[in-house]
């Protein structure tokens, strides 16, 4: 039964990541480079940073994102990273997170699912954190798509299954 759930969660998580990737790719430069906390590039970075963090097996005190990304998202003052990240940098970070998700899903066990997550401020199991993380990605992917629709009268489609399904990983029947 766990193989069924691993596959289903992986596919839906990849679909959420695909929506984020599609929004990043579809964003015109004029929208991408807007300034402030609500900047398109910043929201994309924010969701990728926490996707990466919450897929980690250690808490934020030991977490290090891949270069050139820093830990500004953990600053209580809400410090913006400088300079603004480009699409290629964030799409590279997205691929890093995609691989990390696949590693987490491949190693998932029933015991791991039930274990407490490593973040003291999130009183939940690893399994619940995984679902929370997927909802966070989906929330911001939808937010970015709404921004595209409002500013460019375009957006991206809602995928039914993620890229892993198209790469030959199928739902397994228990």
Residue ranges, per PLM feature:
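Short, contiguous alpha-helical
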Residues: 10-14, 18-21, 29-76, 116-174
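Hydrophobic alpha-helical core bundles mediating ligand binding, dimerization, or RNAP-core interactions
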Residues: 13, 17, 24, 94, ...
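Sec/Tat-exported extracytoplasmic proteins
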Residues: 24-27, 105
């Amino acid at each position: 039964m766990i193989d069924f759930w691993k596959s289903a969660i992986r596919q839906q998580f990849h679909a959420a990541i695909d929506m984020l990737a599609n929004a990043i790719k579809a964003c015109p430069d004029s929208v991408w480079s807007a300034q402030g906390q609500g900047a398109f590039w910043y929201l994309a970075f924010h969701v990728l940073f926490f996707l990466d963090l919450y897929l980690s097996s250690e808490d934020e005190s030991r977490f290090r994102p891949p270069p050139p990304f820093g830990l500004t998202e953990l600053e209580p003052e809400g410090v913006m990273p400088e300079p603004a990240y480009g699409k290629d940098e964030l799409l590279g970070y997205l691929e890093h997170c995609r691989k990390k998700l696949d590693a987490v899903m491949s190693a998932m066990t029933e015991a791991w699912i039930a274990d407490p997550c490593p973040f003291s401020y999130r009183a939940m199991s690893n399994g619940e954190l995984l679902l929370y993380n997927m909802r966070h990605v989906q929330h911001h992917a939808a937010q970015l798509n709404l921004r595209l629709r409002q500013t460019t009268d375009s957006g991206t489609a809602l995928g039914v299954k993620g890229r892993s399904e198209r790469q030959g990983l199928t739902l397994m029947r228990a």
